Swiss-Prot record:
Gene name, Swiss-Prot/TrEMBL: rplA
Key words of the record: Repressor, Ribonucleoprotein, Ribosomal protein, RNA-binding, rRNA-binding, Translation regulation, tRNA-binding
Superkingdom to which the source organism belongs: Bacteria
CDD domains: Ribosomal_L1
GO CC field: large ribosomal subunit
Function per UniProt: Binds directly to 23S rRNA. The L1 stalk is quite mobile in the ribosome, and is involved in E site tRNA release.
Sample GO molecular function, one term: rRNA binding
HAMAP family: Ribosomal_uL1_B
Protein name (database record): Large ribosomal subunit protein uL1
Keyword flag Nucleotide-binding: no
Entry similarity comment: Belongs to the universal ribosomal protein uL1 family.
Organism: Clostridium kluyveri (strain NBRC 12016)
Binding partners and assembly: Part of the 50S ribosomal subunit.
Length: 231
């Protein structure tokens, strides 16, 4: 199989026992991205937290200086003056109950991020079981529940990404594309790592950054020396 052959070629370029510097890792992530499409470059960060405890959750959002390379479709759930404000700011879809019903009845998901004004959360709450498992539920911590919809849309379109520790204590976040220059990946990497380090819960004990790895969509994982993540 072609893909298997490419993957094997990619694995020959890395030493699985080596902890690379961030620069070396970004260079290797691009070299091992051999698929015939613009692969996403993603970070996987294993944290020393127990997400079963509410006081050890790691969640937030950060604007990457060079974005992710992906066109993000934004759905805004609002009413009144906020509708025009959202449209002017570049939202892809703006409305209220009609979109809530569309999601419920038609299983409609032609969007990547949902922004809602606080006065809409009573209605949006009906979507908790649908949007929650997909990581699409608006949340004040990630800045997606706000009356300042224009600012939220602008930040999302500029490259704002959400990060959240999963039940296995890992955070998965895209930091760019194969088409990015190494320096842009490195800039995005540093900004994201700074945010995650700042988000360390006070209840987390011991080593916080257990492991950090970067990979392309179809490429192997490349381990990064967690001591050097901000160098």
């Amino acid at each position: 199989m072609k893909l298997g052959k490419k993957y094997k070629e990619s694995t020959k370029l890395i030493d699985r026992k080596t902890l690379y510097t961030p620069l070396e890792a970004m260079e290797l992530a691009l070299k091992t991205a051999k698929a015939n499409f613009d692969e996403t470059i993603e970070l996987s960060i294993k944290l020393g937290v127990d997400p079963r405890h509410a006081d050890q959750q790691v969640r937030g959002a950060v604007v990457l200086p060079h974005g992710t390379g992906k066109k993000v479709r934004v759905l805004v759930l609002a009413k009144g003056d906020r509708i025009k404000e959202a449209e002017d700011a570049g939202a892809d879809y703006v409305g209220a109950e009609e979109y809530v019903e569309k999601i419920q009845k038609e299983n409609w998901f032609d969007f990547d991020v949902v922004v809602a004004t606080p006065d809409m959360m009573g209605v949006v709450g009906r979507l908790g079981r649908i949007l929650g498992p997909k990581g699409l539920m608006p949340n004040p911590k990630s800045g997606t529940v706000t009356f300042d919809v224009a600012k939220a849309i602008q930040e999302i379109k500029a490259g704002k990404v959400e990060y959240r520790v999963d039940k296995t204590s890992i955070v998965h976040v895209p930091i760019g594309k194969k088409s990015f220059e190494v320096q842009k990946l490195l800039d995005n990497f540093r900004v994201l790592m700074e945010a995650i380090i700042k988000a360390k819960p006070s209840a987390a004990k011991g080593q916080y950054l257990k492991s950090v790895a970067v990979s392309s969509t179809m490429g192997p994982g490349i381990k990064i020396n967690s001591v050097k993540v901000l160098e």
